[in-house]
């Protein structure tokens, strides 16, 4: 075997520092001085977990409250990655008369990566 890690294998060595920053939420915004009661439904994949912001002053008499819920409470990434399939040089395998191809095609010997999204 060669040196180095392949697809699906852990790497050993120094740490890997990562810095990330989420994009600002877009697509859904409610801003008003009124009171909203009820349910706001959002379907689809959202690029953020959720935010709630209260700005301004609450009156000295009364209450202020934010109730926020998101699904069943299980927050996570549901799907990530590519297909893992690729088209490439067919190395002689392809459609042709008598089992002989023209040398190029989508076929058995094509290079398409390792199928895990890293190659």
From Swiss-Prot:
UniProt protein name? Chorion class B protein M2807
Any one biological process term the GO annotation gives:
chorion-containing eggshell formation
Q: Which organism is it from?
A: Bombyx mori (Silk moth)
Ranges where the record places region Central domain = 12-80
Q: Region Left arm: start and end of each range?
A: 1-11
Gene Ontology MF terms: structural constituent of egg chorion
Q: Where is this region: Right arm (Gly-rich tandem repeats)?
A: 81-119
Q: What task does this protein carry out? A: This protein is one of many from the eggshell of the silk moth.
Q: Which UniProt keywords apply?
A: Repeat
What are the record's GO terms for cellular component? egg chorion
Does Transcription regulation count among this protein's keywords? no
Which family, according to UniProt?
Belongs to the chorion protein family.
């Amino acid at each position: 075997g060669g040196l180095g890690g392949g697809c699906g294998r852990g790497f050993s060595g120094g740490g890997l520092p990562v810095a990330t920053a989420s994009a600002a939420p877009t697509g859904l915004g409610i801003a008003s001085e009124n009171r909203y009661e009820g349910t706001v439904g959002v379907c689809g994949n959202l690029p953020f977990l959720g935010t709630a912001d209260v700005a301004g002053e609450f009156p000295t008499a009364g209450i202020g409250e934010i109730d926020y819920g998101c699904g069943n409470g299980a927050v996570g990434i549901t799907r990530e990655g590519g297909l893992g399939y690729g088209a490439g040089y067919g190395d002689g395998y392809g459609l042709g008369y008598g089992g002989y191809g023209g040398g190029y095609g989508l076929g058995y010997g094509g290079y398409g990566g390792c199928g895990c999204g890293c190659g």
